Structures are given as C-alpha cells and as structure tokens.
Amino acid sequence: MAGHSKWAQIKHKKAQVDAKKGKIFTKLVKEISVAARLGGGDPEKNPRLRVAIEKAREVNMPMDNIKRAIMKGTGELAGTTYEEVIYEGYGPGGVAILIEAMTDNKNRTVSEIRHLLSKHGGSLGESGCVSWIFEKKGYILVDKKTIDEDTLISVALEAGVEDVKNDPKEENYEIIVSPEQLNQVKTIIEKAGIPVSFAQVTMLPKNYISIEGEDAEKMLKLMDALEDHDDVQNVYANFDIPEEAMSKAEV
C-alpha cells in the first residue's frame, strides 16, 4: 500500500493529540450530525452513524456531546446544517488528492482549500479529475508483532475479507474488506484474540506516485494543513514517500 499504512498510523496518533485540544470533537460532531440527518438517529439501523460514534468514543468524547450531535442531526435540537462537499486536486509531483469536507458555507471553504493547495505547491482541480483513482474500502491494520501471518490469513479469509497484504517494509498487516463489512470483520478478528490497531472506511488509491526530497516535504505539510482545516473531514492522496521522510511527519 506504498505508505498508506504508515500515514494511517500517523493520522490515528494525531487524532489522539487533537482530542486533547478538543479539535477533533468539532469534526466528529459534524460527522455524527450529518450521519443522523441522512440516515436517522438509531446507530443500529445507521451504519455510518455507528462508525462515527465509535470514532467519538475512541477519543473519549463525552456521551452527552454525542447525544446532542445526534439530536441536532435529527432535528430534535436546533443546530447548524452542514453540507457534504468533495474537492479534487493535485499536490507536489502530480499527486492526486481527494478532500472530503462538511461546511455551512461552500464559498468560504472552497476559497480556503484553494489557498492551502496553492500555498503548498498544489492546485484545485475540476470535479472528477482524480476521484477515479480511488476506491472506497474498509481498511484494517494489525501489528505484525501480535500475530503470525498464517494465523491471521486463516481468520481473515474465514471472515470474508478481500485481501491481506504483508509488505516487508511495513509494521502492520493490511486487511482490505468491503466498506459494509468493516465492523463485522473487525469484530471477528478481535474475537479471535487478534488486536486491531486501526480500522476505518477509507479511499484507497488504485496507483501511487513516488515523490521524495522537497516534493515529499511539501506534500506532507500540505496534508497536515488540509487535515487541520476545521471543515475538512478526510484527505486521501496517492503518494509513495520514503520511510525517512514519512517519519518526520509523526507526532
């Protein structure tokens, strides 16, 4: 997955740090509210809401905050209405970037996203320019130190996964599943006594672009800047960056 595992771990650590600052709460409240508005307030009947609540619990968001966000989404409480938007563009070295955002002011958000891309050597593109490069998948990471490959593959295949990858350069096994099966497969793996270090529905690139040196540094700074934006929920990119450069981005 050419660095996807490493970046997923970095994002996970940063989410924990952001949780201490309360920053991640704002983004999760938006996600919970929108999920509840679109699919109803019952997480048992709304998979997207269930995943959003799990993310909120991972960073210790108070249950009262979660309930209020759901009620704002269902209209039981007054609140801001957020609209989902997707921006597509390019980073240094021609890297494809897909940005998922939630905003109450599309004009403001697109202007700020365009500025961030330009500032870090990228550019905003037209709708559809890079989305074809990405596939929506469930993505699970398991630390190699916790289980041997044969045992994991046996459990994973029985759970109905699409693929198990063992990149010698990565610290984790990577498990690919359909988005709808993510929670089910995660539960099966954990019930088999195998700890899951990361699980999320994501957009996986079909191909990667190798960048290094100044382009790699600019790309990582751009990813940080985009993910730090209050309206941005997720950023996906198809970069392949050397391990030493990637390590500099760690918390």
Swiss-Prot record:
A Pfam family reported for this protein in Swiss-Prot or TrEMBL: Transcrip_reg
Molecular function via GO: DNA binding
Entry-linked InterPro entries: Integrase-like_N, TACO1_YebC-like_2nd/3rd_dom, TACO1_YebC_N, Transcrip_reg_TACO1-like, Transcrip_reg_TACO1-like_dom3, YebC-like
Keywords per UniProt: Cytoplasm, DNA-binding, Transcription, Transcription regulation
Subcellular location(s) of the protein: Cytoplasm
GO biological process: regulation of DNA-templated transcription
Gene Ontology CC: cytosol
Protein family: Belongs to the TACO1 family.
Protein name: Probable transcriptional regulatory protein THEYE_A1868
Taxonomic source organism: Thermodesulfovibrio yellowstonii (strain ATCC 51303 / DSM 11347 / YP87)
